[in-house]
Amino acid sequence: MSDKNGNDQAGAPRIKLKTRLYAWWEGYDLSGLKRKGEESDAAPQPAAAAQPAAPNQGGGLNRWGKPLWTASRIEVAEKLWGKGFNTPGGQDHIPYLVKPLGLNPAMSVLDLSAGLGGTSRTMANKYGCWVTGLEASEFLAKEGMIRSFKEGLEKKAPIETYDPENFSHPKRVDAIVYKEGMFSVRGKDQLFDGMELALKPRGHLLMTDYVIEPALAGAKAVQVWCDKEPMQPHLWSKDQMAAAFAQRNLDLRIAEDITDTHRGLILSAIQGLVEHLERHHLNHETKIAVMDEVELWVRRIAAIEAGMRVCRFYALKPAE
């Protein structure tokens, strides 16, 4: 284990993740540095490299007209977060996250940020509930459905494409889970309306998302994150989120700050990835995908340290 300064419990200094990642990119041997405990806080960053311009089969584009997801990026994401996951929190984290829902085999669930389907399949496997995973990226949804087929969960945890800016669902469900997706939606009110309509009476709504107080929104690190995030963020404050629940008569039972947990998941994943990279050779395209993905999460960490928060919201729809 190590302390917050990067030293292990015996007091020996360790090389910081930034230095190790740069050394991996340049192909340096770190053994000498590890013996001497040398490190530099000012390690230069490799020049940002553009992602390949041609999208892999299907999938949407980011705000600059480049593929939002590629096979290489998915490979990196699964190394970071675990098989079937493309955001923080793998199989071990999901039970903590969804505990308020009280999931059971009689329940139907919508997962509005399905990604590769890891959360959907974890809920279906662990609790026996019937989950429909919805994902904005066509490419991710296809890859997620392939993974559901491989696990024999094509009926219990199918992954489909949808448009969060125009959300409606033909059947009412017992629960909705939406994990760090609302922040990039422009029309949050219409999405809230759609979620409320999709819930059965006494239905559950569980969301985690990035929020920020107006006084902190102008912080440099937050602005850098907003400018460079692949999908344009449209952040609300915690109070705005709470008001959206109240306006739809959804009984908000939990509105808690889980920033420290989220930050810890990111830092632990990046450290694990760096250790993996030091043992494996990757082709140039994958190395670029690694740097792009790590930089994305480092920017999110910087925004968090500048005041952006991650909150978990849990609400109940009243009986009719």
Q: Whereabouts are the PLM-identified features?
A:
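A short glycine-rich, Lys/Arg-flanked "PGG" loop and its adjoining helix->strand segment in the class I
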Residues: 189-204
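Conserved Class I S-adenosyl-L-methionine
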Residues: 3-4, 11-17, 32, 254-320
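Class I SAM-dependent methyltransferase SAM/SAH-binding core
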Residues: 110, 119-165
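A short acidic, Gly/Pro-enriched loop at the edge of an enzyme's catalytic core
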Residues: 168-176
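N-terminal auxiliary segments of SAM/dcSAM-dependent transferases
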Residues: 2-66
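Conserved class I S-adenosyl-L-methionine
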Residues: 106-115
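Conserved alpha-helix/loop element of class I SAM-dependent methyltransferases that forms part
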Residues: 87-105
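Short, glycine-/aromatic-enriched active-site segment of Class I SAM-dependent methyltransferases
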Residues: 210-232
